């Protein structure tokens, strides 16, 4: 569901809204501050929460601002263009715009677009685009024209796609509309023809857009009162070809058809769209929010004083010119679901109020009575019983949130246990909100850390990293290895940077901290069961490599000789190999096993593995090598225990560590012995697989000969007698 909250107005005493309203409302680098540009000479900086202006700047008499002022998110400065070609840059400390930085450009500017994580982009009327920094280096540089002279830009927008700005602008030429998509980094430009209906050419449609995968979803509000969607490819196979794009109906009859003014729309999220204009049943203008997925009107607000047909949205706030005042309307859009669209979400109802049904009762439609009055009464009683059972859950949830904000850890733990035992909530969002409340208080109060409460919530098995991204960060700050192990076991979507941070902590944390931690030891087997024969066998693996190949077989005699010629006392130094006992304590091994089981993508993990200290990399390699020897010593190639690491996981992590830290490991004497063993082992594996391939080829050849022999005997003909 979507709701429009109570509106409020901003003082517009210094602004002069022309007949077409304001030029624009743009976000600044402060979440609560916005730049409002009128259609004359003034720019005002507003702080919405205080409902008052923080500053205003005006150009000289006779000059006029020709595109909305924007904020450079990289520097915090403000940028505007007056008289089409004059660029001005200033900040909060400047008072007189005439004395701030000025640059006169060689071509007329249509608009400046500024989005976060990149520099502002200047779009010229001829369709060319330049980054602000490149433009300031040479303001009078030649600006090419990429669109025909007859075409006029009527709408434009910039999106960030994989850290690359993507510019889209719509042009109009005698009632025909064209879409241009420019990839700013690759400088590619694609042109598309928008196929609009004939009745639309007399009225300019309103546009808004969003990125949907590899397409830009261009949404237009047409003169017939319907909303249409056109999917525009971001990456075109042929940039020279003028492709024709057909639109599809998205919402039917959302405003009165034939309306010429006071109509606008903007996309709020993937499921909701805000529409400004008179509905079909009323002549007065309204602001309404529609659910795109389920084609339903969620909420609306009447605007009796009329509007300029302009609508801006930033964050969770809508801006519009209502009458002569700049009106701000906060809104909220919940996640779209079928239950929400049909009004079937759980809610409380005050006694004595009558609720209007949100859906049609098909059993009583069209004069048909399919059920008796007794059946209807039983359905009513059953529905009331269900609502009575559901009502205590929401107040209990809200009460628990208030307890989390102010009560002690012990009290929170008791109330949380009661709440989970009573209602057992199955919704991810409820558990996520509880974790967010606890983590938020942990950040505000460093001494507050309810480990038991957080553990209970994680053990509900409904959380993920994306639902509570700050939880593991708090656990890392408190060196809570128990919590981190639980998160690694439960969360399927942990980023590689966080996984590597956990690995660094597990390798560096002190034994005293591990001794006091309650760590799950199911994945660790008993290391004390190793027999003397097993130790002797592993010691002999220095001279005789596994699978029956000695060092001489792999032409590794020099390296192996150096390895075997080490003094006897070297084998007993810390960090020396081969490993005859586990190099880490059992609790540390259990933590490392949790890392081995975590999901990762190799390109994203490797850069973070390079940040691990060399001594910790060596220790981790020792442990992985020890696990590998245990695996190869088993006939099933598996380790004992509940969900232990597999051979493939062990080998993958060995390869990852060597790829990320091989140069560093070469400089460490303790790691040289391991590298030589791995080197010899890989060569022996190559040899054994080569021999196995030869045997396989021989077997295939024998099978072929046997098939030929059997076939020859099957089809032979023997002549017994001739007549």
UniProtKB/Swiss-Prot annotation:
The modification N6-methyllysine is found at residue 346. Residues 549-572 are annotated as: Disordered. GO terms for biological process: maturation of SSU-rRNA; positive regulation of transcription of nucleolar large rRNA by RNA polymerase I. Pfam families: Nol11_C, NOL11_N. It comes from the Eukaryota. Ribosome biogenesis factor. May be required for both optimal rDNA transcription and small subunit (SSU) pre-rRNA processing at sites A', A0, 1 and 2b. This is Nucleolar protein 11. It comes from Mus musculus (Mouse). The lineage of its organism: Eukaryota, Metazoa, Chordata, Craniata, Vertebrata.
